[in-house]
């Protein structure tokens, strides 16, 4: 009997292999024909044969091997980090993107520091690990929400504009740096976890190659950033000083007749301090940081279930998908929206795993953040959060303790959401525009300024 079962198993394996071979013989030629029509004789083939495309691909290959050598061959961590930073700075300088990436990165750092200050105020028992990836994601979420809230209040109550917000950002940054410096001086070595990093770490060739691919793919977008801007970016994303804040705050009615100017402007409000500068690169380079955050968050979700090695593999795979990476060089809100949606899912999964109320509140914070970034996020974020919420309720996993739950963060996240939506309501009489106009009409809710939303995309 066992011998008969083995024979049957052998026959089934042979049949499976035969089926796979037949499918491969049918699929491979069709795939090759499609690739040839798209990338050889098609429009993409023409683009790939352009000199600037070939030059950039050659640069990326060289960049990959430079990163690979630095990560794989250099064991001393400080020297490895210095080499990677030098390679990155050199590439950005060649492509005239260094200043933009540096300034936008400094603004990201300010948001992280602001969020960290808020988190430490709510985390009295010091449960959250400093300088940890998940902690950093929470800090960025809290800092971004608080900054948008401050800008909304400044616009609503005092009519502050872009210049005032730049000054406010510099003041906040100075205060945070000074306060943190004093904290570190009094904490000693216990408050400086980077002192505990080992001097040398050996990284395998496989892991080094993955990290090198990720860095090269991210810098590929930085290299493309200054070539040209897409239509939607020029249409509204890069013109905040004209279509959002013309000096009197974000609630000033500038008389625009295009529906896109009535969208939820959370990202544009957040980036007011780096808008209206001599180059659009400052705004666009912030999107590259958001795409990097998307890769990191996706890696954290994978690491939560299958470990760090697979997490790096996931990040490598995602960094090679054009649909994800191309969002990093457009001024549209897609990149940060995806980032915040992944952060929301990460904190929901962490709550299911660890049953800490802080994760649940942070998931709600991330959900509210997505609502101010993109009108259609109401559909997709609600679907994702609702599915996770139903799972938590149906499996009876809802456990909530107010202590250490970060519940005070809702004190500025909810007003932030309402204040961004208030701008749309003020200009149109509707809380949301875009694809929701027909829904409002079916419910009998009419636009008080119909030219704003019925004008479609007919003009600026």
What is each model feature region?
Residues 94-97, 157, 277-278, 305-306, ...:
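Transmembrane helix irregularities
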């Amino acid at each position: 009997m066992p011998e008969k079962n083995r024979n049957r198993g052998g026959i089934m394996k042979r049949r499976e292999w035969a089926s796979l071979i037949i499918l491969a013989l049918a699929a491979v030629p069709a795939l090759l024909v499609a690739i040839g029509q798209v990338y050889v004789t098609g429009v993409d083939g023409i683009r790939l044969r352009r000199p600037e495309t070939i030059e950039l691909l050659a640069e990326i290959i060289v960049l990959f091997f430079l990163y690979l050598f630095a990560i794989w061959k250099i064991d001393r961590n400080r020297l490895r980090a210095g080499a990677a930073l030098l390679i990155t700075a050199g590439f950005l300088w060649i492509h005239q993107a260094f200043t933009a990436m540096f300034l936008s990165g400094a603004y990201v750092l300010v948001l992280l520091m602001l969020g960290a200050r808020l988190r430490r105020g709510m985390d009295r028992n010091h449960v959250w690990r400093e300088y940890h990836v998940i902690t950093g994601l929470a800090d960025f979420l809290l800092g971004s929400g608080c900054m948008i809230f401050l800008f909304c209040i400044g616009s609503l109550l005092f009519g502050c504009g872009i210049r005032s917000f730049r000054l406010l950002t510099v003041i906040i940054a100075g205060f945070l740096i000074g306060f943190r410096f004093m904290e570190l001086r009094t904490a000693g070595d216990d408050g400086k976890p980077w002192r505990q990093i080992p001097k040398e770490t050996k990284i395998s060739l496989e892991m080094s190659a993955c990290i090198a691919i990720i860095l090269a793919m991210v810098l590929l977008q930085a290299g493309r950033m200054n070539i040209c801007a897409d239509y939607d970016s020029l249409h509204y994303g890069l013109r905040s000083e004209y279509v959002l804040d013309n000096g009197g705050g974000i609630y000033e009615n500038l008389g625009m007749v295009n529906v896109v100017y009535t969208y939820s402007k959370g990202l544009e409000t957040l980036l007011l301090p780096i808008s209206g500068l001599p180059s659009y690169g400052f705004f666009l380079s912030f999107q590259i940081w958001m795409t990097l955050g998307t890769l990191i968050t996706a890696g954290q979700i994978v690491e939560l279930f299958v470990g760090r090695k697979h997490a790096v593999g996931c990040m490598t795979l995602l960094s090679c998908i054009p649909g994800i990476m191309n969002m990093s060089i457009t001024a549209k809100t897609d990149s940060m929206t995806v980032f915040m949606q992944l952060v929301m899912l990460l904190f929901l999964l962490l709550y299911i795993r660890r049953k800490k109320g802080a994760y649940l509140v942070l998931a709600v914070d991330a959900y509210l953040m997505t609502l101010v970034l993109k009108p259609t996020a109401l559909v997709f974020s609600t679907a994702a959060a609702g599915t996770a919420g139903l799972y938590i309720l149906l499996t009876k996993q809802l456990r909530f303790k107010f202590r250490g739950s970060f519940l005070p963060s809702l004190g500025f996240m909810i007003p932030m959401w309402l204040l961004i939506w208030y701008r749309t309501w003020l200009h149109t009489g509707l809380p949301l525009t875009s694809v929701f106009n027909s829904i409002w009409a079916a419910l009998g809710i009419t636009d008080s300024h119909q030219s704003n939303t019925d004008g479609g995309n007919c003009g600026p």
